[in-house]
């Protein structure tokens, strides 16, 4: 049975956070996360796609979300920034993930790991990004609704 993408996103968040805080090598971070007993529940391929993809594209992803923020990217908490990077990566690079799912999963990460109202901020920023990068998909959804 394939693992859960939801769990893969949670481990990706932990990996990006560890990379931001400690600056350790991503391969070492991934190896450490895989030792966690709960990792077997994760979709490992999706975890690798997200973790390595987000870190490879971090500058581009940050530049895409920066104009949508009310503060500098560097002023975001590491958790908020990590979640926004994951959501932005999914919106930009994972067309198999519906835009609503990408946003909702990021909001759920923020509710679980972020500050009190961080999920509202995450939702607002990613919704603006989706309006730009998934405009055709959103327009189709509006016509169906």
Swiss-Prot record:
Cross-referenced Pfam families: NusB
Family matches, as Gene3D superfamilies: NusB-like
InterPro entries: NusB-like_sf, NusB_fam, NusB_RsmB_TIM44
Keywords of this entry: RNA-binding, Transcription, Transcription antitermination, Transcription regulation
GO molecular function, one term: RNA binding
One BP annotation, GO: DNA-templated transcription termination
A cellular component annotation (GO) from this entry: cytosol
Source superkingdom: Bacteria
Family in the record: Belongs to the NusB family.
Function in brief: Involved in transcription antitermination. Required for transcription of ribosomal RNA (rRNA) genes. Binds specifically to the boxA antiterminator sequence of the ribosomal RNA (rrn) operons.
Protein name as it appears in the record: Transcription antitermination protein NusB
Gene: nusB
